[in-house]
Amino acid sequence: METERVKIRQLQVNEQNPRTCTDKRFEKRVSSVITFPKMLEVRQIVVGEGGVALGGNMRLRALQAIATMTDDEIMRHIEQSAKYKDRPECEREALLRYWQKWKHDPMVSVVRTDNMTEDERREFIIKDNVGFGAWDWDMLANDWDTDE
């Protein structure tokens, strides 16, 4: 599978994603993405037909939120992070400049699942574990077989 860069507006959060995320955990995810953007190159968003995210839904949501943030909001995330709290101002400003540039043309690396069957896509969604989310047990019980 090859990666490609696409505009985030071409991607959709998967409404059938059986994971949930509290506001507090989502803010942590946003901060995590802001302070470690290189992770987006290593952990691409996995997309199916129509640009629907099968893996990386919370990262996609975080990027969608970052795309609408002011510089002050982004800097607040940077300054409050343990990683950047004691770093020189020039490093914090460099990270802010990265996001300012990114916001002019918000893109992300994706992997497409065109060569997966529907069953393989469903299996992938279940097995792709993201630590900031929590399971939506009702959705799992209603929409997913326990053997999956």
Predicted regions and their residues:
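Short, charged/polar connector segments at secondary-structure boundaries
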Residues: 1-113, 120-148
